[in-house]
């Protein structure tokens, strides 16, 4: 991922221990759409016959989530936020072989608690 951990705080919780929310900037969303290629589908189909983890899809899903998260973070930074709380992921199949992955949360400005 291209952002540094220190750039912005990210949490699935509704608050950040040790920090006070001083401003809510709003909902931020990052979206990516990925296509499952023919080669990956063939390999995955074969692997599903014999059982086990389908590594081609796991890798694609991990990359897609990271890209959606990165896009969400960039939108939060553009709003002037230094944290995103209540982060969630969602995914939908848009068409055969195409998946939409969404990362969303609430962009906020936080300060260290005393």
Swiss-Prot record:
Source species, domain of life: Archaea
SUPFAM superfamilies linked: YbjQ-like
One Pfam family matching this protein: YbjQ_1
Family, per entry: Belongs to the UPF0145 family.
Protein name, UniProt field: UPF0145 protein STK_10800
């Amino acid at each position: 991922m291209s952002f540094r951990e220190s750039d912005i705080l990210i949490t699935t919780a509704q608050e950040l221990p040790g920090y006070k929310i001083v401003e809510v900037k709003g909902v931020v969303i990052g979206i990516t759409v990925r296509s499952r290629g023919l080669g990956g589908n063939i390999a995955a189909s074969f692997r599903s016959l014999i059982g086990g983890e389908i590594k081609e899809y796991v890798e694609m899903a991990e990359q897609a989530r990271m890209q959606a998260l990165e896009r969400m973070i960039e939108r939060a930074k553009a709003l002037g936020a230094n944290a995103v709380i209540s982060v969630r992921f969602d995914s939908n199949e848009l068409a055969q072989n195409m998946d939409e992955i969404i990362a969303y949360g609430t962009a906020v400005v936080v300060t260290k608690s005393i």
